Amino acid sequence: MHQVRTLPTEFSSDGETLRGHFVLPLGEGPFPGIVKFHGIPGSPDQVSGAATLLAQAGFAVLTFDFRGFRDSEGYFTLSGQIDDARAAITHLLESDLTVDTWSGIYAASWGAAVAICALAEDKRIDAVCLRAPVFDTLWFSQLPLVRASAESLRDTDSTQMRGLDDPEIFERTLEKMVEDSRVHNPIHEVSKISPRPLLIVHGTDDIGIPLAGVKRLYELAGEPKDLVVVEGADHNLSDPRAYEITVNTIVEWFKKQWNP
């Protein structure tokens, strides 16, 4: 297996410092760049998995924590994350590690919703891959599951998301999530990704994000687009075979976008 190298990095968004890593191939760059957007809360390890496999395939991958998560400053809001996404794209494109002729986004779950909303207006990205996307932020933000998950995270590991242990911030975070979702909703924005290539990958066993909703998102997207449904894949890719199929699909698709 090819090794990769990681470089710590940080950048600013609305005055908040966001921290992460560049995951890089060995050898001399610059490399084609991809920004990775995590979900809520996303894994504490953003380097392993897809980012490492993409780096092994020749891409420079920028991973980072959105505001309010782990090592980054600030507090979570959807509108803030959209600003973070654009700041991350700027950081990628301004880096000497990346080429200036092509760039991509790989985003999962809630991060996929952020990607769509950011890229509806930001045209600097050339290819977009979404895994298990939250297709409707307003629907999702009002699910009982969201509060239950936030409470569970608060009680088990509040370091993953800032402010959960403050009752006032906790309630305001959930309220603002709904408020922002009335303004920023991928179901209304996904058509604006076209004419940039779009890949959506989803699993048959994802009980949190219904496949029917993902298919609706796909239908609303313009060409060129592809939808890959992975048999046996749940939201967190806990099945090893489904994980392998999913990440290989993503890596091979990005390789084709960089070398059509």
Predicted regions and their residues:
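The alpha/beta-hydrolase serine catalytic core
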Residues: 8, 18, 122-216, 223-224, ...
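Active-site glycine-rich loops that stabilize anionic/oxyanionic intermediates
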Residues: 31, 36-42, 204
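The serine-hydrolase catalytic nucleophile loop
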Residues: 39-52, 66
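Alpha/beta-hydrolase active-site loop signature
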Residues: 41, 65-70, 135, 234
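Catalytic nucleophile-loop/oxyanion-hole region of alpha/beta-hydrolase
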Residues: 41, 69-101
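Conserved alpha/beta-hydrolase
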Residues: 51-73
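Glycine-rich nucleophile elbow surrounding the catalytic serine of serine-hydrolase chemistry
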Residues: 106-117
